[in-house]
Amino acid sequence: IYNRLFNTENTFKLFDINYSEGEFIAKEDVRTTMLHIKLNSVIPGFTLDQEGFLEKVSVFAGFKDIAIEDHSDFSKRFYLRGEDSVAIQRFFTDNLVLFFESNPYYHVESNGTSVLVYSKERIAGIKEIKSLHNFGKRLQTELLICTQNIG
């Protein structure tokens, strides 16, 4: 981890990271810019990504896309997965779904107490960092509203 930017509370961190995917001959080194948001409350663990070919065939490997009722367009455009599908469906309110539908695609992962957000598997430029920061601040607000609605 390098090129770190964070707020004084250390709850909102932007950073560049190098990591490896795969093994042996298929090993690939990845460099990317990520945003980590520490939450003040607990939310369901989930992964949200753009629906693509790999996500569509992952059903054969046992992975299941969680559908959000009355939001078929969202379910076609995004791949949502997590262990507690009922809690995730309850958490993804109409406003949260609309938030994701009306913004550029970002990969978003929640472990329950924090959220990790990134866009592309490469180091972001200044304009992309500003966009990621802006998206993250607005996402943080939306997630807070969702926790108040279900809590």
Where are these regions (language model features)?
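Charged, low-complexity intrinsically disordered regions
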Residues: I1-G151
